[in-house]
Curated annotation (Swiss-Prot):
This is Photosystem I P700 chlorophyll a apoprotein A2. Its main location: plastid. One of its GO terms (biological process) is photosynthesis. The gene is psaB. It comes from Nandina domestica. Pfam families: PsaA_PsaB (PF00223). The lineage of its organism: Eukaryota, Viridiplantae, Streptophyta, Embryophyta, Tracheophyta.
Length: 734
């Protein structure tokens, strides 16, 4: 018999039902569960797949560069970044006739095009690219890297080049390589690019391979470096009247501490960013030399962790046993990596708009909104994944004997206290926040808005004041105009910072009031509830009072038969499943808040947000309903406009989202009967019956139906909001 899918599991391949396909897809990446897997093959498969992932990333970024060079308008955008709309790529086949062709022909293009809201134009411009040829060169280089990555992945699966398990578990060498080799060297290389190419480019000097050895990045060359007069590199920075991309008002400094933003581009000073990357490079190059490898000097991770026993005895045996637990569990390591990556992705979202790094991106409002929302959603999925793999670690890899009385075991021992505290925090936040919103709703409904309960966020305002915001009148730390810190800030360090904080047209320390106070606590409710579900799922993954033997059932079990009440819906997978709904809900509130606050800031009517955000009807009517009007008018009796594609996506997103409920709520047997009926009709229809249906249809398992429902819910939710966000922002700001 020919090999059937899935090849990695003979048991599944012989299953005569549709389970074969579903379970095959579900376990394709669960290498640990495959036939004939060994620890060595497991590590080698994961290692090789990393190269495949890199190849895909390089191919994708190469495609971005290639399509903009081929079909975009980069060169004309560079001439006037604030008024030319950047083109992502052409639309080959615009449906709906001539009106569609006209609606989508913009940005100076000859035919229908898509506008870029990803910020790549601003990024490429900032780092010194200027022509289509530059973009093609970059695309080819990344294509080359993609091919190299594929070859490397294939190579490391060949017997001669397969690394051993001991190589994968050599924590110190990996730390040194990642810290120095990846972070340190790449940050240093990026500093080099900024100093040699980007900064001269911002001053009208076009540096390429043919002249980069002749153009001095700084008039004094390397002299100040070798004589220790490093401050010379900071002297004569670009002036406030500097026109980006020209020599007008340009200085000669390459590494500065100006603070604040370039007045024309509204982005951070390139010379500040070069300085930042140089400092990062230095720190990581040092950090990558701290761990003991071939030379018998430096730290051993195991010794470090074994020594971490707090003397008070309140953490028991501290970190004893953690080294082997972490180093031998891929799921623990993946959980740590996902948690870190999730947090950093959310930080990227917060910093991209408040401290924009790319020239003119702060004035491209739709791009700002799209990038913020994109990074927050990505962060949410990555963070929930961290807890999922934490739970799998507890089920598959945790060894109680190895971790006796250390911090990990103690966390499991007092999980009731952790879970109940999180529960209490969630209940407190939920009831109080909803109570305030609903009270305010009722007051407005009864025509007595002055009876709202409006709470000023005085602690947050105090923190903003401490960082230099003067409008609240707190007169503390950096906002105290006669204090030593304030005076030093004016002259020695970051003189531009205080100007930027108090300039009301950017997004640094937005002025906050009662509406912000309420939505902050609504978001806190979402964060705490999501965390509660995820933490409970992981801490109860091995067992609970109700089901002490839970770990024997694996990560995703539906129930333990009809004879054991209460064992349904309590697997670690169910916790992940529930948490994703809360995560999406929370990020919905976060992005609504960000978007509405910024729309009113950009339009110059901040009072609309301040007055309407203190009650729920305000959010529903003045944010969602009011801003969806343009979107819904993408098609109307008079024809169509360039928002029509978002109108269609908005409807389609709702459709996908609603489809999710059919799987989340319907009986699963309904689907089995439906599929059987379709199969019956299929086999009795000429031509169609040439393709035989081999697998007997069986109902989706409970877990599968939930997964399909969750996938539709998530995808539909994000599609719907993406269309709303882009249409409502681009419809207002051209």
């Amino acid at each position: 018999m020919a090999l059937r899918f899935p090849r990695f599991s003979q048991g599944l391949a012989q299953d005569p039902t549709t389970r074969r396909i579903w379970f095959g897809i579900a376990t394709a990446h669960d290498f640990e569960s495959h036939d004939d897997i060994t620890e060595e093959r497991l590590y080698q498969n994961i290692f090789a797949s990393h190269f495949g992932q890199l190849a895909i990333i390089f191919l994708w970024t190469s495609g971005n560069l290639f399509h903009v060079a081929w079909q975009g308008n980069f060169e004309s955008w560079v001439q006037d970044p604030l008024h030319v709309r950047p083109i992502a790529h052409a639309i080959w086949d615009p449906h709906f006739g001539q009106p569609a062709v006209e609606a989508f022909t913009r940005g100076g293009a000859l035919g229908p095009v898509n506008i870029a809201y990803s910020g790549v134009y601003q990024w490429w411009y900032t780092i010194g690219l200027r022509t289509n040829e530059d973009l093609y060169t970059g695309a080819l280089f990344l294509l080359f890297l993609s091919a190299i990555s594929l070859i490397a992945g294939w190579l490391h699966l060949q017997p001669k080049w397969k690394p051993s398990v001991s190589w994968f578990k050599n924590a110190e060498s990996r730390l040194n390589h990642h810290l120095s080799g990846l972070f340190g060297v790449s940050s240093l290389a990026w500093t080099g690019h900024l100093v040699h190419v980007a900064i001269p480019g911002s001053r009208g000097e076009y540096v390429r391979w043919n002249n980069f050895l002749d153009v001095l990045p700084h008039p004094q060359g390397l002299g100040p470096l070798f004589t220790g007069q490093w401050n010379l590199y900071a002297q004569n920075p670009d002036s406030g009247s500097h026109l980006f991309g020209t020599s007008q008002g340009a200085g000669t400094a390459i590494l500065t501490l100006l603070g604040g933003f370039h007045p024309q581009t509204q982005s951070l000073w390139l010379t500040d960013m070069a300085h930042h990357h140089l400092a990062i490079a230095f720190i990581f190059l040092v950090a990558g030399h701290m761990y003991r490898t071939n030379f018998g000097i430096g730290h051993s991770m195991k010794d470090l962790l074994e020594a971490h026993i707090p003397p008070g005895g309140r953490l028991g045996r501290g970190h004893k046993g953690l080294y082997d637990t972490i180093n031998n569990s891929i799921h623990f390591q993946l959980g740590l990596a996902l948690a870190s990556l999730g947090v950093i992705t959310s930080l990227v979202a917060q910093h991209m708009y408040s401290l924009p790094a790319y020239a003119f991106i702060a004035q491209d409002f739709t791009t700002q909104a799209a990038l913020y929302t994109h990074h927050q959603y990505i962060a949410g999925f990555i963070m929930t994944g961290a807890f999922a793999h934490g739970a799998i670690f507890f089920i598959r890899d945790y060894n109680p004997e190895q971790n006796e009385d250390n911090v990990l075991a103690r966390m499991l021992d007092h999980k009731e206290a952790i879970i109940s505290h999180l529960s209490w925090a969630s209940l407190f936040l939920g009831f109080h926040t909803l109570g305030l919103y609903v009270h305010n709703d009722v007051m407005l409904a009864f025509g007595t808005p002055e009876k709202q309960i409006l709470i000023e966020p005085i602690f947050a305002q105090w923190i903003q004041s401490a960082h230099g915001k003067t409008s609240y009148g707190f007169d503390v730390l950096l906002s105290s105009t006669n204090g030593p810190a304030f005076n030093a800030g004016r002259s020695i360090w970051l003189p531009g910072w205080l100007n930027a904080v108090n300039e009301n047209s950017n997004s640094l320390f937005l002025t906050i009031g009662p509406g912000d106070f309420l939505v902050h606590h609504a978001i806190a409710l979402g964060l705490h509830t999501t965390t509660l579900i995820l933490v409970k799922g992981a801490l109860d993954a091995r067992g609970s009072k109700l089901m002490p033997d839970k770990k024997d059932f694996g990560y995703s079990f539906p129930c333990d038969g009809p004879g054991r009440g209460g064992t349904c819906d309590i697997s670690a997978w169910d916790a992940f499943y529930l948490a994703v709904f809360w995560m999406l809900n929370t990020i919905g509130w976060v992005t609504f808040y960000w978007h509405w606050k910024h729309i009113t800031l950009w339009q110059g009517n901040v009072s609309q947000f301040n007055e309407s955000s203190t009650y729920l009807m305000g959010w529903l009517r003045d944010y969602l309903w009011l801003n969806s009007s343009q979107l819904i008018n993408g098609y109307n009796p008079f024809g169509m406009n360039s928002l029509s594609v978002w109108a269609w996506m908005f409807l389609f997103g709702h459709l996908v989202w609603a489809t999710g409920f059919m799987f989340l709520i319907s009986w699963r047997g309904y689907w089995q009967e439906l599929i059987e009926t379709l199969a019956w009709a299929h086999e009795r229809t000429p031509l169609a019956n040439l393709i035989r249906w081999r697998d007997k249809p069986v109902a989706l398992s409970i877990v599968q139906a939930r997964l399909v429902g969750l996938a539709h819910f998530s995808v539909g939710y994000i599609f719907t909001y993406a269309a709303f966000l882009i249409a409502s922002t681009s419809g207002k700001f051209g």
